A protein has these predicted regions:
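Cysteine-dependent hydrolase recognition
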Residues: 1-191
Length: 191
């Protein structure tokens, strides 16, 4: 699914092609991923806890940027995702606020080849730590599937039970494909 219809507001926008267009949405679109009234109530309670004074802390000043290495498409720009993430990180950090910016860029990690395929030592544990220590935003730029981030499987739905940040809920932003299949009612994916 795409939110382009709702987020591209100019009359001349909407014919997006990665080769010919540099259009950016004018307004961010979000949704509550619920299917039942009980899920909606639970989400509302979570938001109320988040907005309460008990939820305040230094973790709300932290942004974590995670960038894929664009493997296996080595003929393309391998640091494309790092450049995209870094551009956003610079904008967040340039106002001289108390914001802390941390980076988990896959290009910076050693590669391990195993029977399971290509893996990057430490990325998965660093991502889990980023969530668990608390961050206002964790922003991922890169490849993704319905239940996994990156070809190297740096984070999967099976990792979600390892998260212990219920009292420090993170806004998880992903610039990837297939991850939040809100338009597929047969599967819950990450949406």
């Amino acid at each position: 699914g795409s939110d382009d219809f709702f987020g591209l507001l100019d009359e001349t926008e909407g014919e997006w092609s990665p080769q010919t267009s540099s259009e950016r949405i004018d307004v961010g679109i979000g949704r509550f991923p619920v299917n039942t009234l009980a899920q909606a109530r639970g989400l509302m309670q979570k938001i109320q806890r988040y907005e309460s004074a008990e939820s305040l802390g230094d973790w709300r000043n932290r942004f974590v940027f995670v960038a894929d290495d664009d493997f296996p498409e080595v003929e393309r720009n391998r640091d494309l995702h790092a450049l995209n993430a870094d551009g956003t990180a610079v904008e967040i950090d340039k106002n001289g606020t108390a914001t802390r910016v941390d980076k988990i860029y896959m290009l910076s990690y050693p590669v391990e080849n195993s029977a399971e395929g290509r893996r990057l030592a430490g990325v998965r544990s660093d991502m889990i730590r980023a969530f668990n220590e608390g961050a206002l935003v964790v922003n991922y730029s890169g490849h993704g599937g319905q239940f996994v981030l990156s070809d190297e499987k740096i984070f999967t739905v099976d990792d979600v039970p390892l998260l212990t940040n219920a009292d420090r809920p993170t806004i998880f932003v992903t610039a990837t494909c297939q991850l939040g299949r809100y338009d597929d009612h047969e599967s819950s994916s990450w949406a």
